[in-house]
Amino acid sequence: MSLNSLKSKLKSKPQLSNIFGVVSKISSTSIEITGLRPSIGDIVKIISKNSLKDGLGMVTEVKQDRAYVSPFGFVEGFRIGDMVYLNESGMNIPVGMELLGRVVDPLIQPKDGKGAINCTDYAPIMRAPIDAMKRGLIDEKFGVGIKTIDGLLTCGKGQKLGIFAGSGVGKSTLMGMIVRNSTAPIKVVALIGERGREVPEFIEKNLGGNLDSTVIIVATSDDSPLMRKYGAFTAMSVAEYFKDQGMDVLFIMDSVTRFAMAQREIGLALGEPPTSKGYPPSVLALLPQLMERAGKEEGKGSITAFFTVLVEGDDMSDPIADQSRSILDGHIVLNRALTDFGIYPPIDIQNSASRIMNDVVNKEHRENAIKFKRCYSLLKENEVLLRIGAYQKGSDKELDFAISKKAYMDDFLRQGANEGFSFEEIEKKLSEINNK
């Protein structure tokens, strides 16, 4: 062998520094490593010297001679000098029909005590959204069995919607109604940043314990920021697997706000400058990367997505709420004041909108919905006059008509948590209100 060919072979061999490194510094939220030359987004495995703890982490920052890793778990138990290796499987998770009926964490490790999950297919957690020119037109209704939504804020198959509400207004109950009443053959639920006790409560109370067609991905509030962040992306990857099989998928995530808070923790720890309400720029850049992955793709299935947004102090100008509204195809606002009148779910139809509705409903449905909203708005505008008895019947024919329909409209807006209606039933009820 010539000297030149030997040199060429040696250059082509991976350098030792590319294979493993060591932990050189540990902080409360990240681990500094040296001797490894990773790229941002690489997954590494940290092998503890004391053999009590091994863990995975993601490379979030790279400098000339060192890199910084955010662990999927917590840093306790790791020591300076622990070995660090690049994880060969990268950011891939197992996916398959075996996930149906299971509750898993963001790394697809079972949390339900039902044993190991044996999937043969793998999918990347991070993936580009559907190409704009490959998106299918949204021209089919997507029923969720809720009168207010299907009748007045009709969704389309492949649409992305937000559910905006303050704490304790009924987001979880509404989520459960949507999952339970939806006709979608596959349902993927992401519970991100939830309290631990809320997970079994959601499954038993809102889903009735029936998970046959459902996959639940859980990252509770006590999980690391990286687990909470990637829990959302893992759930979307699972939904994409079923979409790629030609299936229509319901994706529902609670909540975008806690997902954003997880990225805020990561970003601030890396030295990003805080902007509005302490959120670094990476948070606002991350939202479309997640939300735009939902939709309808030509030649494949669809992902119809509902993202809940926790609005602090019912402030709809919150930066996460603002950014989410700009990305999504519609928004459903829950109003705390409506609960005082016994209206559940407390959907504020004046401040809610579905941008797809006109493309998926027929002319009669559209006209009946417009009449309903017009009557509702008139009653709200004249609420004070009506309450103090200052309005004289006959002064305004349109308002008189609205007053005559108030009881029927209130009944339409109310729905029990365990009730569900078909599209045909809802369209009939809406038509009857305008023609009674």
PLM regions and their residue ranges:
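N-terminal accessory targeting/assembly segments
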Residues: 1-102, 107-111
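A generic structural signal for well-ordered coil/turn residues at beta-strand boundaries
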Residues: 19, 27, 40, 99, ...
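Flexible glycine-/small-residue-rich
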Residues: 25, 35, 48, 61, ...
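Active-site phosphate-binding and catalytic loops of NTP-dependent enzymes
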Residues: 53, 91-95, 109-116, 133-136, ...
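P-loop NTPase nucleotide-binding/switch module
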Residues: 82-84, 91, 98, 111-159, ...
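P-loop NTPase catalytic core
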Residues: 151-152, 158-436
